């Protein structure tokens, strides 16, 4: 249950923080216009997408095409609009954050997920740059000490790489564990945040 009497109560409490409503989540973005752009950064190809309310996807990979297919799968009912010059500033801010994460990213988010996922994502946003937390520690912070696997699943479902810093979650012994954007990218991000690169 994630500590709320219902999903609606969680969404009411967090709508200003993470954005997308349950209806929009279930409808695959129906009625949404999502602007996106694909660029290159030091971690590879990066796709940044946003609704009028905020960033809804930051996807990182080796090639642009799989990133676009991922976005289309996430929002099959949305109108996707690419290559708009006025969106370049947003993309530049995200890339700047990837390159220098200690500077922070001051952009609104509009992400979709279950009440539990969104609760995990909010907890992740409270982990400062340069720090790490284990899946178990994060579950304990949520008041759910036995939910480490569920926390890992929520991290894997994170649609906004770096803005919701699931790369800051490590194994209990401090070693790196899986990262949907690639373990080497996770290592690079953590080193940057620690000031090692």
State where each predicted segment sits:
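Basic nucleic-acid-binding alpha-helical/helix-turn surface characteristic of O6-alkylguanine DNA
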Residues: 2-3, 8-146, 192-197
């Amino acid at each position: 249950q994630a500590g709320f009497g219902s999903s609606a109560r969680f969404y009411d409490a967090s709508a200003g923080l993470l954005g997308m409503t349950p209806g929009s989540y279930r409808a695959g973005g129906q009625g949404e216009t999502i602007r996106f752009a694909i660029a290159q950064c030091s971690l590879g190809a990066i796709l940044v997408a946003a609704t009028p309310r905020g960033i809804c996807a930051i996807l990182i990979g080796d090639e642009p095409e799989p990133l676009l297919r991922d976005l289309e799968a996430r929002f099959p009912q949305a109108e996707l609009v690419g290559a708009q010059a006025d969106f370049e500033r947003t993309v530049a801010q995200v890339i700047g954050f990837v390159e220098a994460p200690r500077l922070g990213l001051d952009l609104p988010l509009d992400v979709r997920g279950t009440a539990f996922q969104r609760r995990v994502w909010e907890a992740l946003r409270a982990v400062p740059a340069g720090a790490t937390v284990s899946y178990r520690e994060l579950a304990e912070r949520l008041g759910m000490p036995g939910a480490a696997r569920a926390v890992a699943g929520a991290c894997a479902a994170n649609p906004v790489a770096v803005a919701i810093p699931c790369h800051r979650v490590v194994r209990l012994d401090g070693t790196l564990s899986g990262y949907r954007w690639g373990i080497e990218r996770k290592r690079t991000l953590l080193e940057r945040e620690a000031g090692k690169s």
